[in-house]
């Protein structure tokens, strides 16, 4: 999507904002009490790894375009994590996928942020750090790579 199609130009989310949104999202995930975190390929991997490490939970992976879910042994409660949600297309496809293949698994969808394009019915069903009135380019948080110590990356890793 071209940036000019948005009501206002995108702006880069600051590290402080991203940290606050991530923590809000993580608090809601904790309240759901999952037994596994699932990274939505590709953009959800960083956030999902951080959440899994913080919560000391196993990490699975999901490729929506090919309907492939890699998880541990039949978890009861999982949270899919992606970076953002716009129209909700991937989320809606995942709802159908989970109903068909994992009908006994309770699950939630979590994102760092949604924006004004995200339909209200989708926003009401998901975990989100924040709803933004613009399209944000989230920071890379380059120094926050998964490591022995949260937020620290050692040269030999």
Question: Residue spans of the language-model regions?
Answer:
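PRPP-dependent phosphoribosyltransferase catalytic core
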Residues: 2-8, 96-157
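Conserved P-loop NTPase mechanochemical-coupling segment
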Residues: 6-7, 41, 51-55
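Active-site-facing substrate-recognition patch
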Residues: 1-31
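Short, glycine/charge-rich flexible loops or terminal/linker lids adjacent to PRPP-binding catalytic cores
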Residues: 48-82, 86-96
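Short glycine-rich phosphate-binding loop at a beta-alpha junction
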Residues: 32-43
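Short beta-strand/turn micro-motifs composed of small residues
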Residues: 39-41, 82-85, 111-114
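A structural signal for isolated positions on well-ordered beta-strands in alpha/beta enzyme cores
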Residues: 36, 60, 79, 108-111
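Glycine-rich phosphate-binding loop signature in dinucleotide/nucleotide-binding domains
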Residues: 29-33, 73-74, 102-103
């Amino acid at each position: 999507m071209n940036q000019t199609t948005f009501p206002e130009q995108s702006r880069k989310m600051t590290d402080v904002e991203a940290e606050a949104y991530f923590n809000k999202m993580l608090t809601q995930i904790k309240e759901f009490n999952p037994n596994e975190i699932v990274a939505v390929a590709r953009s959800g991997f960083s956030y999902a790894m951080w959440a899994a490490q913080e919560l000391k939970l196993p990490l699975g992976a999901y490729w929506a375009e090919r309907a492939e879910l890699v998880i541990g042994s039949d978890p009861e409660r999982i949270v899919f994590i992606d970076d953002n949600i716009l129209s909700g297309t991937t989320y809606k496809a995942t709802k159908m996928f989970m109903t068909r293949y994992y009908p006994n698994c309770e699950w939630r969808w979590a994102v760092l942020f949604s924006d004004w394009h995200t339909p209200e019915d989708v926003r009401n069903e998901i975990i989100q750090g924040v709803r933004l009135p613009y399209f944000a380019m989230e920071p890379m948080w380059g120094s926050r790579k998964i490591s022995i110590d949260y937020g620290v990356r050692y040269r030999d890793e």
